[in-house]
Amino acid sequence: KGSVMVEPQPQLAVVILATGQGTRMKSRRAKVMHEIAGKPMLDYVLRVAERLEPQRIVTVVGKDSEEVEAYFEGRTEFVRQLNQKGTGHAVLQARKALENFSGEIYVLYGDTPLLCAETLRGMVSKKRISGASLTLLSTKRRLPGLLQRDQEGFVERIIESTDATTE
């Protein structure tokens, strides 16, 4: 009787961006620590990340992150972004922590508590089927952030909605 060859799945790591200070919320707490139904926003994102069963979860936090680190100790590794220079810079802060990791890396925002595991699993599946080097999960909004692409279609930069102009 024949056997079926199953290709091993690549290792998976999740980077969670949790550097927001909550200034637009008029709060001194880290944005990801604001509660929804009695739990910090970051708790929901971590639960979704954990359901992907990654080998590593690395959370990028801001300079005043003691509350976040104490609350989530043991569930994630932390790296700090001391100077906030945008989304791309925040992602780069995880590079050293993942320098010996050779699998797929998925980046999530820590302030997206409504993200569900099924959506992420679908994205991971589509990425693996397509063989894409970069996969973005996006949604249609009235005031979206923007992706600026070069002539070949590669992402050059992320423009936050607050910085976007009509250009």
What is the role of each PLM region?
Residues 66, 115-167:
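Conserved core of the sugar-phosphate nucleotidyltransferase
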Residues 18, 61, 109, 136-139:
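Short beta-strand/turn micro-motifs composed of small residues
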Residues 10-36, 71-72:
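Glycine-rich N-terminal loop/short-helix segment of MobA-like nucleotidyltransferase
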